[in-house]
UniProtKB/Swiss-Prot annotation:
Modifications the protein undergoes after translation, according to the UniProt entry: Phosphorylation at Ser-14 by AKT1, promoting the interaction between CASTOR1 and RNF167.
Name of the protein in its database record: Cytosolic arginine sensor for mTORC1 subunit 1
Protein family per UniProt: Belongs to the GATS family.
Keyword Phosphoprotein attributed: yes
C-alpha cells in the first residue's frame, strides 16, 4: 500500500452562525468560482453549533479575520492511502483503521478525518509529520507530493527521538448520539455546479430548519442540521440528509448504484479540541473489527461517523458496550 502526503497545507476554522453574513461573498467565491481562486482544498461543514471550514493557504487568504472566525493554531497536512497507485474508492475509514489510525493513536498523533465520495483524507499536524513517517514507514511506501509529482520518502529505521507506542491510561470515553436523519453521500460534475448554485446557496446560507421526517416523535427521534460540501482538487463531494436532497435536481446528483442511505454517530458531549489522540481510533477500530464501512467527518467541535442505515443499531450497540467496558476499567 502507498501513503501519499499531499501538497495542501490546511487550516481548520470555526465560523459562528451569527457571522455567516460577513463571509457570504468569499464563501460563494470558493464554492462556485474556483477559477478565480488558487484554492485547491476547500471543505465546508454545517453542524448545529457552527460551520467548520478546512481550507488550504490560498483559501485561508480569502477569509478576513473577525470576531466570528475562530482559527485552530496548527497547520495540517493531508494524506490518503492508495492501492497500486489508485486511490481506494470504497467508504473506507474502517479499511485504514488498523494500518493508519490505530498506530498513529498509539504514538500520540492527533488526527482529523475528512471522508468524501471519492476518498478518505487523513489530516495530521505539520509538526507531527516526522513521527507519522516513522510510525507508518514499515507498513507503507510513503510518497510526498512536490510540484505535483510523488517523491519517495524514506523512513528512518532508528527510533531515537521518537515516542514509542504506548498503551497508557484508557482513552476518554466520549458520549455518542445518533440523530434520526438519513444521509446521502453524493458527487456532482463540476460543470453542472452552476445549475444547482441557487439551491446550494439556499441550503447552506438560508435554510436552517430541522428536516420534516423527524420533526415529530419521541425524545430520541431528533434530527440535526448537517451538510458537508467539499471541492478538493476539482472533485466535489456532498453529504446531506435525504430530505434536503429532495430540493436538488435528481438527475445532477450522482451516487453509488445502490443508492445507499447512511445514519450518523455523533461523537462528543463537549467540544473535543485538537490535542486528544485516539478519538477516531475509538470509533474506527470497533467498526473495522466487524467490517462495517464508515465515512468519517471531523469538525471543529465534534466528530461524525456515517454508517449504513441497516447497520446503525448494531453499531450503536457495539460502541456502547465498548464505552461501558472502558468506563468499568476506570478507578
Amino acid at each position: 500500500m502507498e501513503l501519499h502526503i499531499l501538497e495542501h497545507r490546511v487550516r481548520v476554522l470555526s465560523l459562528a452562525r451569527p457571522g455567516l453574513w460577513l463571509y457570504t461573498h468569499p464563501l460563494i467565491k470558493l464554492l462556485f468560482l474556483p477559477s478565480r481562486s488558487r484554492c485547491k482544498f476547500f471543505s465546508l461543514t454545517e453542524t448545529p453549533e457552527d460551520y467548520t471550514l478546512m481550507v488550504d493557504e490560498e483559501g485561508f487568504k480569502e477569509l478576513p479575520p473577525s470576531e466570528f472566525l475562530q482559527v485552530a493554531e496548527a497547520t495540517w497536512l493531508v494524506m490518503n492511502v492508495s492501492h497500486s497507485g489508485s486511490v481506494v474508492q470504497a467508504a473506507g475509514v474502517t479499511k485504514i483503521a488498523r494500518s493508519v489510525i490505530a498506530p498513529l493513536a498509539e504514538h500520540h498523533v492527533s488526527v482529523l478525518m475528512l471522508s468524501t465520495y471519492q476518498t478518505d483524507f487523513i489530516l495530521v499536524r505539520e509538526q507531527d509529520l516526522s513521527v507519522v513517517i516513522h510510525t507508518l514507514a514499515r507498513e507503507f511506501q510513503i510518497y510526498r507530493e512536490v510540484g505535483g509529482e510523488p517523491v519517495p520518502v524514506t523512513g528512518d529505521d532508528s527510533s531515537n527521538g521518537f515516542p514509542q507506542a504506548q498503551h497508557g491510561p484508557s482513552p476518554t470515553v466520549h458520549p455518542i448520539q445518533s440523530p434520526q436523519n438519513r444521509f446521502c453521500v453524493l458527487t456532482l460534475d463540476p460543470e453542472t455546479l452552476p445549475a444547482v448554485a441557487t439551491t446550494l446557496i439556499d441550503v447552506l446560507f438560508y435554510s436552517h430548519s430541522v428536516p420534516k421526517e423527524a420533526a415529530s416523535g419521541g425524545p430520541e427521534s431528533t434530527s440535526i442540521p448537517f451538510f458537508a460540501f467539499s471541492l478538493i482538487e476539482g472533485y466535489i463531494s456532498i453529504v446531506m440528509d435525504a430530505e434536503t436532497q429532495k430540493k436538488f435536481p435528481s438527475d445532477l446528483l450522482l451516487t453509488s448504484s445502490s443508492g445507499e442511505l447512511w445514519r450518523m454517530v455523533r461523537i462528543g458531549g463537549q467540544p473535543l479540541g485538537f490535542d486528544e489522540c485516539g478519538i477516531v481510533a475509538q470509533i474506527a477500530g470497533p467498526l473495522a473489527a466487524v467490517d462495517v464501512s464508515a465515512y468519517y467527518i471531523s469538525t471543529f467541535n465534534f466528530d461524525h461517523a456515517l454508517v449504513p442505515e441497516d447497520e446503525i443499531s448494531c453499531v450503536i450497540d457495539i460502541l456502547q458496550r465498548r464505552q461501558e467496558g472502558l468506563a468499568s476499567k476506570d478507578p
